Amino acid sequence: MAKGGFPGGFNINNMIKQAQQMQEEIKKMQEELMQKTVEATVGGGMVKAVANGRKELVSIEINPAVVDKDDVETLEDLVLAAVNQALRNAEEMIASEMAKITGGLNIPGLF
């Protein structure tokens, strides 16, 4: 049996090293995701929401043509749809980046 190992070739020291390396890669990725953005545009380009890789809203752009004081509800719906889609896009971006590091393993609690 190898030093630090278990029957069957399992080596706890190697596993710890791999976990530490993955942790460092995840930290680096989190820093990189802060700089990346995704966007969502709804209403034929009338409302655009931009989110970063921390699922934070960075900006909202509203075309003045969609602003109607007699129909605020439509604008509210468009803003809500754009924000929700931008946040979903951020989730997908994060999942894609995480899969590169974890090899597709779903590790709860990382984000």
Swiss-Prot record:
Subcellular location, record wording: Cytoplasm, Nucleoid
Keywords on this record? Cytoplasm, DNA-binding
Q: Does Cell membrane show up as a keyword for this record?
A: no
What GO cellular component entries does it have? bacterial nucleoid; cytosol
GO molecular function terms listed in the Swiss-Prot or TrEMBL record: DNA binding
SUPFAM superfamilies, A to Z? YbaB-like
Pfam families, sorted: YbaB_DNA_bd
**What InterPro entries would the database entry show?**
YbaB-like_sf, YbaB/EbfC
Query: So what does this one do?
Result: Binds to DNA and alters its conformation. May be involved in regulation of gene expression, nucleoid organization and DNA protection.
Q: Which family does it belong to?
A: Belongs to the YbaB/EbfC family.
Q: Which NCBIfam families match?
A: DNA_YbaB_EbfC
- List the HAMAP family hit by this protein, alphabetically: DNA_YbaB_EbfC
Q: How does it assemble?
A: Homodimer.
* Protein name, per record: Nucleoid-associated protein Teth514_0034
- Native species: Thermoanaerobacter sp. (strain X514)
